[in-house]
Amino acid sequence: MNRMVSHRSVWIFFALTLLLSWAIWIPTQLLVPENKQLPLQLLGGFGPFLAAIIVIGVKEGKSALRQWLRQTFHLRLNLIWYLAAGIFLPFGIALLHHLLYLLAGGKSAFTFDQTWGIYLAELVSTALVGGGNEEPGWRGFATPRLVAKFHPIVASCIVGIFWVIWHIPLYFGSWVGKDQPLLWFFIYASGLSIILTWLYFRSSQSVMPVMLLHAGTNIVFDFFPRTNVIFSSADLDFNVFKAIAYWIVALIIMVATKGKLGCRDAYPDSTSDSYGGA
C-alpha cells in the first residue's frame, strides 16, 4: 500500500463519512417527528462503511475493494475472540463500571432479567444495524491507514475524535443526546476506540469481533443502574463511571502491549517511521 495515498485517502474517508451520514441525520432531526426518526438514524449509521467502499473503489480499484472486503469480513478466527468480543469484554467492562459505582456509594441494582437468547439476538441485530455496522469504516478502513503514519494510540484517538464528531447530529434527536453528555461521550469513546483498535489487530484485522464488541457495549449497560451518588444527575454519574471503566481497560491494554495495541503483529516489517517517528 502506498503510504502517501493511504494517508490522503483516510481524510477523504472522514469527510465523506460526515457528508453521507449528516445528509440523512440533519434533515431527519429538523423535519421528521421523534417517534419516526429511528429508521433514518439507523440508515445514517452505514455512512462509515459506505464511505470506505467508495474511497477504496474510486482510489484503489475494484480488485482492491474485493480484497479489502475479504480481509475485513473474514470469519476464520478462534472461537475465543467471538466469545470475548460478544460476552466477556462487554460484561467485564460493565461489571467494572458497576464496581466503581458501588465504591462511590451506590446501591447494587444490577439485573439481568432477559434470557441469553434475547441478549444474543440483540447483540447480532445491533452488530448489523445498530452500531457494529460502523466498524468496517472506522476500524477496517481508517485505523490501519492511520497506523501507517501515526503511533497506534494516536491513530485510535484520531478515529475516536471523528467518531464523536460524526455523532453530533444525533444529540439533537431522540436517540443519544438526552442521556449521554457530549463531553463524557468523547472521553469514553476515546478509551473504547483504543480497545477496539487492539481487538481489530489481535483478531487478524477482521472487523467481525469488533462489530460484536461495539454492539455489546451498546446494549450491556441497559442492565445497570442509573442512580446519582456523586452528581445531581443520574445520567452524569452513569457516564462518568462508564468513561473511567473504559479508560481503566484501555490503560491495561496499552501497558500490556507497550502501546502497540497489537498492530506490530499486523505490520511486522514496520519501523518507528511508520508511526510518524513516535
Tell where the protein language model's regions lie, with residue ranges:
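Aromatic-anchored segments of alpha-helical transmembrane domains
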Residues: 18-26, 90-95, 161-170, 215-224
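Alpha-helical transmembrane segments
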Residues: 10-22, 45-49, 82-93, 158-160, ...
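Membrane-helix interface linkers and caps
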Residues: 2-4, 24, 28-85, 99-115, ...
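Juxtamembrane helix-entry segments on the extracytoplasmic side of multipass membrane proteins
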Residues: 109-124, 174-187
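Membrane-interface helix/loop boundary segments of multi-pass membrane proteins
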Residues: 133-160, 174, 201-206
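C-terminal membrane module of polytopic membrane proteins
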Residues: 57, 205-208, 213-278
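Hydrophobic alpha-helical segments embedded in the membrane of multi-pass proteins
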Residues: 186-195
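Membrane-interface starts of transmembrane alpha-helices
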Residues: 8-9, 36-47, 150-159, 206, ...
